[in-house]
């Protein structure tokens, strides 16, 4: 015969997985068109030249080039892509 009362069960112990947000390509890194530069919720970082914005505010490169981050007068960070110069053949 058991001499222990039944223990209660906890209702805690769950957590959701991280969303993998953040900067994927940093300043001066080379990107090819279509590369994701930043995954974000809302437009924390604003789009600049040669970048597109996805439905979920993901910023991605529209052209091959180098990533450039800049801080504008209003204090917002903008990201753009400087196109690579065409190689002389």
From Swiss-Prot:
Q: Which UniProt keywords apply?
A: Ribonucleoprotein, Ribosomal protein
Cite the residue spans of the region called Disordered.
Answer: 1-22
One GO term in the molecular function aspect is:
structural constituent of ribosome
Transmembrane domains' residue ranges: none
S-S bridge residues: none
Q: What SUPFAM superfamilies does the annotation carry?
A: Ribosomal L27 protein-like
Say which domain of life the source belongs to.
Bacteria
Gene Ontology BP terms: translation
Q: Which NCBIfam families match?
A: L27
**Name of the protein in its database record:** Large ribosomal subunit protein bL27
Taxonomic source organism: Acidiphilium cryptum (strain JF-5)
Tell me what gene encodes this: rpmA
């Amino acid at each position: 015969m058991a001499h222990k009362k039944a223990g209660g069960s906890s209702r805690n112990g769950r957590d959701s997985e991280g969303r993998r947000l953040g900067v994927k390509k940093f300043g001066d890194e080379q990107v090819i068109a279509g590369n994701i530069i930043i995954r974000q919720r809302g437009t924390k970082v604003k789009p600049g030249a040669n970048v597109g914005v996805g439905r979920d505010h993901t910023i991605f490169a529209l052209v091959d080039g180098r990533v450039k981050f800049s801080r504008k007068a209003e204090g917002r960070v903008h990201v753009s892509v400087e196109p690579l110069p065409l190689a002389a053949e």
